[in-house]
């Protein structure tokens, strides 16, 4: 077998990608130039891999590195090393050989070395579909990291959203408890609802504004307020009675007291203003006066 004079296309493109200073924020050499680090795997797979290798699969890139003898240095960082892949020593790339992969035949259990039948020319830029994983590809570097990073980002965003929703719900809960306490105090003080009845109301849930009056009437909280003497019927407060007293709960009218009508009041009215009218019987016997003969009738004022 003749000695290779040019590096494999995959190695050459990878070296150019790492050595490009314009992409150091995504992929670059380490400080001493003996390894290279992929700092941003998502941007690397999205922007750089399609430009150099016509695909965007970071896992395929890692598997291809494994077939050329690269190894992952630390588990928590995408840092790879090869003794013949160093900064400023591009000529060493020709010494990097593609590892031979062994495939088993379906008929009889014999194994054939696939790399032995392959020429040096076809072992270059076959990243992705043509290469099979070597035993070293089972290391952490072969994990589908871009997918996990995307999932982690989505989960982080969802977590922040849930935190905001939780804060908003906590604030609404405090407000609801405050309104509940006000309702219990009102029912106990003004409507005279027993504590066990309040517990039954609370177990049924907070009523809406439209059904609040029906619920209060159902538990017997508001009966006839005139009969209970809840309103002051004093004659000294006639002006207030003319206006009418109302009982509201959270803006819902529970009871309105109208002015009582006296037992001796005449119900006859005159005109639209409802003014009371009195009638006089001019034909009554007291309206007729008899005077002695010869004397004129006089009306005394």
From Swiss-Prot:
Residue ranges with Low complexity bias: 107-142
PTM field: Exhibits temperature-dependent phosphorylation.
Oligomeric and partner information: Homotrimer.
Stated role: DNA-binding protein that specifically binds heat shock promoter elements (HSE) and activates transcription.
TM region positions: none
Biased composition (Acidic residues): 233-243
Keyword Translocase: no
Principal location: nucleus
Annotated localization: Nucleus
Family classification: Belongs to the HSF family.
Keywords recorded for this protein, A-Z: Activator, DNA-binding, Nucleus, Phosphoprotein, Stress response, Transcription, Transcription regulation
Protein name as it appears in the record: Heat shock factor protein HSF24
Key word DNA-binding present: yes
Molecular function via GO: DNA-binding transcription factor activity; RNA polymerase II cis-regulatory region sequence-specific DNA binding
